[in-house]
Amino acid sequence: MSSDADAHKVGLIPVTLMVSGNIMGSGVFLLPANLAATGGIAIYGWLVTIIGALALSMVYAKMSSLDPSPGGSYAYARRCFGPFLGYQTNVLYWLACWIGNIAMVVIGVGYLSYFFPILKDPLVLTLTCVAVLWIFVLLNIVGPKMITRVQAVATVLALVPIVGIAVFGWFWFKGETYMAAWNVSGMNTFGAIQSTLNVTLWSFIGVESASVAAGVVKNPKRNVPIATIGGVLIAAVCYVLSTTAIMGMIPNAALRVSASPFGDAARMALGDTAGAIVSFCAAAGCLGSLGGWTLLAGQTAKAAADDGLFPPIFARVNKAGTPVAGLLIVGVLMTIFQFSSMSPNAAKEFGLVSSVSVIFTLVPYLYTCAALLLLGHGHFGKARPLYLLITFVAFVYCIWAVIGSGAKEVMWSFVTLMVITALYALNYNRIHKNPYPLDAPVKQD
């Protein structure tokens, strides 16, 4: 029986590519333009961010070796802090997974408008986005092996322009172009680096992907930690080398208004054909990451449903172990949100929802850091000082990211937390038919 289950699971390389693909997603292709508002000094922001992201990846790597349970942050929060925080973590992360997909598919299909101008029509764009979302829902239903293969191909295609610019872009790199825009933010050095962090801190969302998908990974105790750290390192190298090279290729004034920095850099170096290839690869990278995030939405909901913290329908699986009903529900919700974002006013509001959903992932990150301090207590051995330092750095990384968010985004995130509290009480009453034990003794830990 176990061998049949393992046959549907995936190995180290596909999981590592899923992590790096989920991290880079669509954002990497717009990063140079976003960072151009600060200038070349952004390299310092990258160094700070990479230290924080690596610390967070090491937190997840250690947690997955201590507890290889599927569900990632949800499983850790539930084990260490009880069902309430487990429920809260799962709802936040589940929402973030599929809401983020809606923003990502619009960007990915938008790149395809380079080849099919009709996609610039709002109705055609929306219908195409819905079709693409359902393609990835159906691929997930086929099984995790299928979706990780698709994402592996998509990630490799996305890496073509990124690695190409990171390696060969330096032949067109001009030091004077880079240094002429060293700090164009109008702020002092510290302020400029802080403004950079507001962009770069978000660039590593997805570091937890392997631990959430542990239930479909072969030998998770070994492969999940390696895939987590490996995926972050791949993303970090690609980010720094490619964005720095582009900042030395394209003058700052042009880069700040560029809608396709990688495409512009490729056209500058090799002509229009190269620009078209980059647009295709960017679309493949964006759309390919949809598969991984849809898989995570299904797996985190299934893990909670198995524990009774999500409706039982999310735990129903097919022969491949895929939570079919949960994925179909996610598909319906994504379709509704996709159509609701067609009008200009709704699109503006959805932009806020997308930003809030990113903050949703930071709360599970913070809980995972705290969980490592509890679960690792007495198990770190001589490495205890190192893991305390790593956890502290990861804490600071997450908190700094929240501080850099807008006040409106933080407010709505807090409102969501309050709503989840009420939902937890209703869910408790659904599961427990007997009266609440008023005389139950208070546990002394």
From Swiss-Prot:
Keywords: Amino-acid transport, Antiport, Cell inner membrane, Cell membrane, Membrane, Transmembrane, Transmembrane helix, Transport. The record marks W202 as: Periplasmic (proximal) gate. GO terms for molecular function: antiporter activity; identical protein binding. InterPro entries: AA/rel_permease1, APC_superfamily. Residues 1-11, 62-83, 143-144, 205-223, 302-325, 374-384, 428-445 are cytoplasmic. It comes from the Bacteria. The keyword Secreted does not apply. Agmatine binds at I23, A96, C97, N101, I205, W293. It is a multi-pass membrane protein. Residues 25-41, 110-124, 168-192, 244-276, 343-349, 405-408 are periplasmic. The chain crosses the membrane at residues 12-24, 42-61, 84-109, 125-142, 145-167, 193-204, 224-243, 277-301, 326-342, 350-373, 385-404, 409-427. It is found in: Cell inner membrane. The record marks Y93, E208, Y365 as: Cytoplasmic (distal) gate. Its main location: membrane. GO terms for biological process: amino acid transport. The keyword Transmembrane applies. GO terms for cellular component: plasma membrane. The record marks W293 as: Middle gate. It catalyses: agmatine(in) + L-arginine(out) = agmatine(out) + L-arginine(in). L-arginine binds at I23, S26, A96, W202, I205, S357. Homodimer; each subunit has its own individual transport capacity. Belongs to the amino acid-polyamine-organocation (APC) superfamily. Basic amino acid/polyamine antiporter (APA) (TC 2.A.3.2) family. Each subunit has 12 transmembrane (TM) helices; TM1 and TM6 are interrupted by short non-helical Gly-rich loops in the middle of their transmembrane spans. TM11 and TM12 provide most of the homodimerization interface. Each subunit has a central cavity which probably binds substrate. Major component of the acid-resistance (AR) system allowing enteric pathogens to survive the acidic environment in the stomach. Exchanges extracellular arginine for its intracellular decarboxylation product agmatine (Agm) thereby expelling intracellular protons. Probably undergoes several conformational states in order to translocate the substrate across the membrane; keeps the substrate accessible to only 1 side of the membrane at a time by opening and closing 3 membrane-internal gates. This is Arginine/agmatine antiporter. It comes from Salmonella typhimurium (strain LT2 / SGSC1412 / ATCC 700720).
